């Protein structure tokens, strides 16, 4: 009995590692950039692949464990990732806005550098969003199969998991709807 509790609680390590990896990516890039000044043999290109690697780990966990993860656990994993990455995307959006505003400085080269930085940060952010999607898509599909959410809402929710800001809004809506469904199920069970 204790082994199942440990196994079920261990699933939460994966989204926490994903969130930590996303937050540590800029720090590791900065540290490797500082180390590169002192030695030429340090490559920081692998750090940019971190969202892809962590996203593949998320996908592998969801595909391998599949039915062993409950709907509630999938929702908690989704909420951990989506809610914890709100400050990350907020700061990324601010950096993009600053990069785009730098286009209007009198330095001519910034006309080209500002949009390049903005596009690069947007791609990294979207890859992070893509890497966070396996848990949320698995939750939405499972909830639809169990009758918690309708098919139309589920289709829209899956589509919007790949758009900034709307993904978090849909996770909030789905979590509230799941809570209401769970309360209704408890009432029916008690009667």
PLM region descriptions:
Residues 8-25:
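Alpha-helical transmembrane segments
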Residues 171-191:
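Membrane-interface alpha-helices
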Residues 91-136, 144:
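Membrane-proximal helix-loop-helix units in multi-pass membrane proteins
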Residues 35-41, 67-80, 144-151:
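Membrane-interface helix-boundary motifs at transmembrane edges
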Residues 43-55, 82, 121-129:
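Alpha-helical transmembrane segments of polytopic membrane proteins
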Residues 58-80, 100-108:
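Membrane-helix interface/capping segments
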């Amino acid at each position: 009995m204790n082994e199942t509790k440990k196994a079920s609680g261990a699933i939460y390590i994966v989204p926490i590692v994903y969130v930590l990896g996303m937050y540590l990516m800029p720090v590791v890039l900065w540290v490797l950039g500082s180390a590169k000044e002192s030695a030429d043999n340090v490559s920081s290109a692998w750090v940019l692949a971190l969202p892809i690697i962590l996203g593949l780990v998320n996908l592998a966990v969801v595909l391998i464990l599949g039915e062993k993860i409950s709907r509630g656990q999938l929702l908690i994993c989704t909420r951990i990732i989506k809610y914890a990455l709100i400050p990350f995307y907020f700061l990324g959006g601010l950096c993009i806005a600053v990069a785009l505003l730098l286009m209007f400085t009198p330095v001519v080269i910034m006309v080209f550098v500002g949009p390049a930085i903005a596009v690069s940060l947007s791609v990294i952010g979207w890859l992070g969003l893509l890497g966070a999607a396996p848990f949320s898509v698995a939750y939405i599909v499972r909830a639809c199969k169990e009758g918690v959410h309708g098919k139309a809402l589920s289709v829209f929710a899956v589509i919007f998991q790949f758009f900034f800001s709307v993904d978090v809004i849909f996770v909030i809506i789905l979590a509230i709807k799941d809570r209401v469904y769970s309360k209704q199920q408890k009432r029916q069970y008690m009667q």
